[in-house]
A protein has these predicted regions:
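Conserved N-terminal beta1-alpha1 strand-loop-helix module at the mouth
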Residues: 1-48, 55, 116-137, 143, ...
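Conserved, mostly hydrophobic/aromatic
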Residues: 18, 50, 77, 151, ...
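Glycine-rich beta-strand-to-loop/alpha-helix junction loops that act as flexible
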Residues: 21, 163-165, 195-198
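Structural beta-sheet core signal
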Residues: 49, 105-106, 163
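Conserved anion-binding
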Residues: 54-149, 154-159, 169-171
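A broadly conserved detector of short glycine/acidic/proline-rich loop/turn motifs that flank catalytic sites
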Residues: 110, 185, 199
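Substrate-binding cleft of secreted/luminal carbohydrate-active enzymes
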Residues: 190-193
Length: 223
């Protein structure tokens, strides 16, 4: 977990939210995680757990509790809508159970090669998500600006679009991941770019985070 604390110190000034995969932290303990969350809050960062919930509402509500108590510290979570809109109710109920509020980002598109989130499915996700107050926004495909333009048109201005699949080095990554440039993603309609290995695997994460922030902010100003 030392690396996570280091990230807050080195990239915190250049980001708005810190994306986590809590179940990938090998040395996780409740005590250390609590300290980590406190450090993120002190740095004025949202904690974005990229859990991609997909089960029915009741199970998702229980998963938000569970070993990691995601409901107790996450500000945002991701979810598929394949099981129906009740999943959003379940996730929101989990936050309510502990007196907190949070937002759900629904996966409307994905950037991985061969994914099954086709346009007809995307349209249904957007329609259901726009009508639900518990939906903060949507996940779009940052590697394909032409898809993002269509998503932006469908979503309108009432919800945000966050996009993974962006990298300053455009191309293909590991295990089917694809990358587009953050500027292109923002110009196409993204409100926030999600960067993982492009920052935390860099030789100088702080400099890279600042570079992504500048590229995306400049694009937003030009949009």
């Amino acid at each position: 977990m030392a690396g996570l604390f280091d990230l807050i110190e080195t990239v915190g000034a250049s980001i708005a939210a810190l994306k986590t995969h809590v179940d990938l932290v090998d040395d996780w303990t409740p005590e250390a995680w609590s300290e980590f969350c406190a450090a993120a809050k002190k740095a004025d960062l949202l904690i974005f757990e990229d859990r991609k919930f997909a089960d029915i509402g009741g199970i998702s509500r229980k998963q938000m509790a569970g070993v990691y108590n995601i409901r107790g510290w996450s500000d945002l979570v991701t979810a598929h809508l394949i099981s129906g809109p009740d999943i959003v109710d379940g996730l929101q109920a989990a936050w309510s159970d502990v007196g907190r509020e949070g937002g759900v980002l629904l996966l409307a598109q994905m950037s991985s090669r061969g994914n099954l989130l086709e346009p007809a499915y995307t349209a249904k996700v957007v329609a259901k998500g726009k009508a639900h107050s518990g939906v903060f926004g949507f996940i779009g495909n940052g590697s394909r600006p032409e898809e993002l333009v269509l998503l932006r048109d469908a979503v309108g201005d009432g919800k945000l679009i966050w996009t993974p699949g962006v990298n300053l080095a455009v191309g293909d990554g590991e295990m089917g991941q694809r990358y587009g440039h953050p500027r292109d993603a923002v110009l196409a309609g993204s409100d926030c770019v999600i960067v993982g290995s492009g920052i935390h695997k860099a030789d100088n994460p702080g400099e890279q985070a600042a570079a992504y922030a500048k590229a995306s902010w400049d694009a937003l100003c030009d949009r």
